[in-house]
Amino acid sequence: MKYDVIAYCWNDALAGFTREDAQRLTHVNLAFGLIKDGLLDLHLLKYLHLLPKLREWNPEMKIVLSVGGWGADGFSDMAMTEEGRRNFAKSCLDAVEKYNLDGIDIDWEYPCNDAAGIGADPRDKENFTALLATLREYLGKDRIVSLSLIHI
């Protein structure tokens, strides 16, 4: 049986990534992109210029951008409308193409629940589903759309 070995890599850890790290993994999820004004915001990710080196070390490794994380606001408002979902998905596609990423991972903590101190709405559940469908539409069937979740 073949297993995937997936690691979340925080921005600063990317600077210390080694050839051995890259060769151990099938996937690396870069943490975290955020949402600002309804669009993908990469200002925290200062080491994206190192991604070609990771690809050189392990050409088969999938590199996925994780968006969100604990306390990351903006999902509920962005996903509330079709226009918001489309604008966000387009900004994700732009980043995927610019940085040669293999996909987007959504870490929305938590739809319908403001436990993390972020905006939430009872409609988040269906809007989350619509967001994932929109991401799939924009990224296409050959790119990764994944999510980190508990129960919704």
Annotate each predicted stretch with a short phrase.
Residues 24, 100-102, 141:
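Short loop/turn motifs at secondary-structure junctions
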Residues 117:
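Catalytic palm subdomain of template-directed nucleic-acid polymerases
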Residues 28, 104-106:
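Hydrophobic residues within beta-strands of alpha/beta enzymes
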Residues 150-152:
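Conserved small/polar residues in nucleotide/adenosyl-binding loops
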Residues 125-143:
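Active-site neighborhood of glycoside hydrolase catalytic domains
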Residues 1-96, 112-113, 123-126, 134:
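Glycan-recognition patch characteristic of GH18 chitinases/ENGases
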Residues 6, 146-148:
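Soluble periplasmic/extracytoplasmic beta-strand elements of cell-envelope proteins
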